[in-house]
A protein has these predicted regions:
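A short beta-strand-loop element at or near the start of a globular domain
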Residues: 41-49
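Terminal beta-strand-rich extracellular "head" domains
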Residues: 28, 34-37, 42, 54-136, ...
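Short amphipathic
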Residues: 21-32, 49
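Short, surface-exposed terminal/edge motifs of secreted or surface/virion proteins that either
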Residues: 6-17
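Short, small-residue-biased leader/transition segments that mark boundaries at the very start
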Residues: 2-4
Length: 178
């Protein structure tokens, strides 16, 4: 937990005030993760999760996520990720559009023509969340691909053809007075 000097009193601003950072949490996720889920559904990225406990019920949480994602040598597919918030057992997907059958926080299309070398890409998203609680709020990253049953494998922090090509993924949570 960190308090930004000269930004906000440690207990936050008076109710109705706006602006100011109360606390910042950061996770540098450097583990290699892979999923060969055959359904194309979302899976949790093990250990790519972080919690913050807001000091105020009306605070917003600035969520910034950067995912280093890769693919295997098999086929082109859509790599996608999403962020989920859990408060007291209630899970909510956040940072997604209000509609769409493939709603996601971020993603990209990877087309691996003729088994060309698959790459690793960084995808960043930043958005405000309003959990409206002073209880612990957990944020986690999930990944998926678009080709169920295809043998597609998604990776976090490496590309598909070699574990020597590595990346690092990050999550930053900032409690901001609204």
């Amino acid at each position: 937990e960190m308090c930004i000097r000269d930004s906000v009193p440690r207990d936050g601003l008076p109710s109705g005030s706006s602006g100011g950072i109360i606390q910042v949490k950061n996770l540098e996720f450097d583990e290699i993760f892979s999923s060969s889920d055959t359904t194309g559904g979302y899976v949790d990225v093990t250990n790519f999760t972080m919690s913050i406990t807001p000091t105020r019920n009306d605070s917003k949480i600035l969520v910034s996520v950067d995912v280093a994602g890769g693919m295997n040598d098999n086929v082109g597919f859509n790599f996608r990720y999403r962020v989920q918030r859990t408060v007291g057992g209630t899970v909510t997907t956040i940072g997604i559009p209000p509609s769409g059958s493939y709603a996601m926080t971020g993603g990209y299309n990877l087309y691996n023509e003729n088994n060309a070398v698959p790459y690793i890409f960084g995808m960043s998203r930043t958005f405000f969340d309003s959990p409206a609680t002073t209880s612990s709020v957990n944020y986690k990253v999930q990944v998926s691909h678009s080709h169920a049953g295809s043998g597609a494998v998604v990776y976090v922090n490496r590309r598909g053809s070699s574990s020597n090509w590595r990346g690092i993924s990050t999550m930053t949570l900032m409690e901001v007075c609204s």
